[in-house]
Amino acid sequence: YTTTADLNIMDTYSSAYAYSYVSNGKISSSFINVGSWWTDRYGTDFGTYSLQTIHHEIGHAIGLGHQGNYNGSASYSSDAMYINDSWQASMMSYFSQSENYNVIASYAFLMTPSAVDWIALDDIYSDYSGYGVSNAFTGDTIYGFNTNISASQSNIWYSFSDYISSAAY
């Protein structure tokens, strides 16, 4: 038991950011701020930019970086480092699906990490946790609507379709 948290989430400041303390090459604790100004402006429900921002900042807190060399603001035409840089591929991207003219996708906010995020997290943590893709569901797994994942296997994956009305692709 400890009196300090590994992950501290607050709304003290008006901006959205994450900061991590690193010790011996590992994150020892992180602070995430998504200010009340942010949630007042973008809402707090599922499918809002606020929820996507919280996911993005948690991504930083657990070791993920942006998809390019940008921070604070960016333009796809001048800052994207690869052709698929958009929310469609990663919650860590700064670019909506409609900002990236190279992808065919509808504008939508993300409800979960995207494909690139899962791959990066697997790369960072699978050797330490045993939760990597090599230990994930095998076979013809259906995620979301009409999932074949039972609640006993993963209540989180089982419940995703209850919270989303539109996909981010």
Language model features with spans:
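RTX-like calcium-binding, glycine/aspartate-rich low-complexity repeat tracts
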Residues: 1-169
